[in-house]
C-alpha cells in the first residue's frame, strides 16, 4: 500500500548512536524501524522489529537489509579487530544490492588530510575514508552525520581523575585556554538522523550534518564543574611526559594535539552545516552547562 511507512534499518541499534537513532525515529512516527544487532534476544529498544546482523559477517547483511528504504550505518573503531573500511564497505555494497534509497553514514573528519599527515588519529580518519565509498555507491540519497566529542565521556573515561590531594582534575597535554572541542550529548544525534531521513531534499545530496551542542576549552569545562560546586582543576603537561602515563596515552596525546591545532571538526567555519543539522532535527542541541546541571554526577573513579 502507498500509505505504508517506509522502513529504516539501523545498525548498532543497541549502542549510543544507533540507540538514539531508534528513539528519535520512534518518536517521529514517520518510519518503521528495524533494529540490527548481533544479539536480537537481548534487544530492549523501541524498534518495530529486530534482525540479526554482524558487520564481521557480510553474509548476514542481505537478509538484514531486505525491504529497507533507508539505512543508518555506524561502525565501532574500539571493538577489537575492527576494520572499519572493510566493514562499512561490505554494508554499503549490501545496502545498494538490497535497493536501499537513502544511506546515512556516521563519519568523522579526515585528520590525515586536514593535517597533511602530521597527526595520526585512526578512529577519525578510518571513518572519513569510507565517505568516498558511500558517494560512489550510487544511492538515490546519501547523507553524512558527524558525532561530537561526547559530553558523557567528559564525566566518564575522559573525565577528571582523582588527584593526590583527593580533588578531581585533568592532567593533559593540551592548552586549556584553547577552545577546540566540538561537543554534544550523543543521545541527540538521533534527532539529526531522523530529520535527515524525513527531509531528503535538504540532506540527501551528500550533506554533512554535525551535532554540536557546545564549542569549548578545558578551562570552560572546569568553570562549569566549579560552578556546580565541584572542586576540579586542570594541569597542562608536556606531550612527551604524558605519553608514559598509561598504555594508550601517546595516542590520546596525538588526538588532543590535533584538537588544539585544528579543532575537533577541523579548520574553517562549520556554521552552515551546524545550522542545517539543527534545522532538520527541529531543535537546538543541549549546551554542556545545561546537560551538566541536569545530569552531572562526578565520582572519584569515572566509569566507562
Q: Where are these predicted regions, by residue range?
A:
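Short secondary-structure boundary micro-motifs
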Residues: 47, 165-166, 268, 274
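Intrinsically disordered, low-complexity segments enriched in small/polar residues
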Residues: 40, 88, 97, 264-266, ...
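Oxidoreductase cofactor-interface core, primarily capturing Rossmann-like NAD(P)-dependent enzymes
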Residues: 2-46, 53-66, 73-86, 93-102, ...
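A hydrophobic C-terminal alpha-helical subdomain
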Residues: 204, 239-304
